Amino acid sequence: MTFPRALTVIDDNGMVISIIFWFLLIIILILFSIALLNIIKLCMVCCNLGRTVIIVPARHAYDAYKNFMQIRAYNPDEALLV
């Protein structure tokens, strides 16, 4: 089946359509890489937020508990072997 000659504007053997598809592919790859970078940035923000909201207050609470209960740091020289 051949394409009607009356509808052919330029006989370029598909060069224009090929270039359009390559540009679309490049644009899609650029958009995908931008989305991937945004996902990585979101993971970093969540990690920092988790550390700020959960880990640092828990560490402060544990330090306060250690000071209140007078728990000393582990010293291998003072450890008793039973």
Curated annotation (Swiss-Prot):
It is found in: Host Golgi apparatus membrane. The chain crosses the membrane at residues 20-40. Homopentamer. Interacts with membrane protein M in the budding compartment of the host cell, which is located between endoplasmic reticulum and the Golgi complex. Interacts with Nucleoprotein. It is a single-pass type III membrane protein. The keyword Zinc does not apply. Residues 1-19 are virion surface. It comes from Canine coronavirus (strain Insavc-1) (CCoV). This is Envelope small membrane protein. Belongs to the alphacoronaviruses E protein family. Disulfide bonds: none annotated. The lineage of its organism: Viruses, Riboviria, Orthornavirae, Pisuviricota, Pisoniviricetes. It comes from the Viruses. GO terms for biological process: disruption of cellular anatomical structure in another organism; viral budding from Golgi membrane.
